[in-house]
């Protein structure tokens, strides 16, 4: 267990953030979660959040004791100041800068800043996020350098010693599935597979081996490929 007492986990209801909640529950005495409603097209992720949290409590009695308050924050202003495939009903395409139009400029910067403010009020020393720059779509606000710079800025701006943890930063999606198995065994893998949501289009009609989704958006492709590689390694 970490020497830090408490952590606040950015929890969307997806695979990565659910894995991060379990990771934090293994390390910290007190864990709270925070989610953001920013007018996302795949708002179904917000709908599954309460069920995922309840299931995490059921998987491990110790997790139930540690898991505290869930904070839901309205950041609908993001959809008002951005024009992306994450907040608008438009086709997912690549932009001239090489990024998919699912990139929401400043989103993770704003998420972390708001989360740091909540952590300050709640007396929590650690922020945990599922950012990753191995299996990812190239978003610049998911990079390790961005998170390190943001940690410095937040601590300077609030005179704190807040730590930003990104346990998935240097692992691929197959390793993320393996981390979930190591943390919570088959029950956690099954919960992530059937209970969480990642698909950018909000598709929850068909349950695939890797979970629900359209199977063609960047998020589904990463999740499906990661699960296939994970399953192959487990045989």
Curated annotation (Swiss-Prot):
Keyword ATP-binding: yes
E.C. number: 6.3.4.20
Keywords associated with the record: ATP-binding, Ligase, Metal-binding, Nucleotide-binding, Queuosine biosynthesis, Zinc
Protein's pathway: Purine metabolism; 7-cyano-7-deazaguanine biosynthesis
Superkingdom of this protein's organism: Bacteria
Swiss-Prot/TrEMBL GO biological process terms: queuosine biosynthetic process
Cofactor binding summary note: Binds 1 zinc ion per subunit.
EC class name: ligase
Keyword hit for Nucleotide-binding: yes
Cofactor: Zn(2+)
GO molecular function, one term: ligase activity, forming carbon-nitrogen bonds
One Pfam family cited in the UniProt record for this chain: QueC
Binding-site list for Zn(2+): 199, 214, 217, 220
NCBIfam families named in the record: 7-cyano-7-deazaguanine synthase QueC (TIGR00364)
Role description: Catalyzes the ATP-dependent conversion of 7-carboxy-7-deazaguanine (CDG) to 7-cyano-7-deazaguanine (preQ(0)).
Record protein name field: 7-cyano-7-deazaguanine synthase
Lineage of source species: Bacteria, Pseudomonadati, Pseudomonadota, Betaproteobacteria, Burkholderiales
């Amino acid at each position: 267990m970490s020497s830090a007492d408490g952590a606040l986990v950015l929890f969307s209801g997806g695979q990565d953030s659910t894995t991060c909640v379990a990771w934090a529950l293994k390390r910290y005495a007190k864990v709270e979660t925070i989610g953001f409603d920013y007018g996302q097209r795949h708002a179904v992720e917000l709908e599954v959040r309460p069920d995922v949290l309840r299931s995490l409590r059921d998987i491990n009695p110790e997790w139930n004791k540690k898991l505290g308050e869930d904070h839901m924050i309205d950041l609908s202003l993001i959809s008002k100041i951005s024009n992306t495939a994450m907040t608008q009903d438009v086709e997912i395409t690549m932009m001239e800068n090489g990024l998919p139009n699912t990139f929401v400029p400043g989103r993770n910067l704003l998420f972390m800043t708001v989360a740091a403010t909540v952590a300050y009020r709640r007396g929590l020393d650690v922020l945990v996020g599922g950012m990753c720059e191995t299996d990812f779509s190239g978003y610049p606000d998911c990079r390790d350098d961005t998170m390190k710079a943001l940690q410095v800025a937040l601590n300077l701006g609030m005179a704190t010693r807040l730590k930003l943890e990104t346990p998935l930063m240097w692992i691929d999606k197959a390793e993320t599935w393996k981390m979930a198995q190591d943390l919570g065994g088959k029950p956690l893998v099954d919960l992530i597979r059937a209970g969480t949501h990642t698909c950018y289009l909000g598709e929850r009609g068909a349950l695939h081996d890797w979970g629900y989704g359209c199977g063609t958006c960047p998020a589904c492709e990463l999740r499906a490929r990661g699960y296939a590689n994970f399953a192959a390694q487990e045989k």
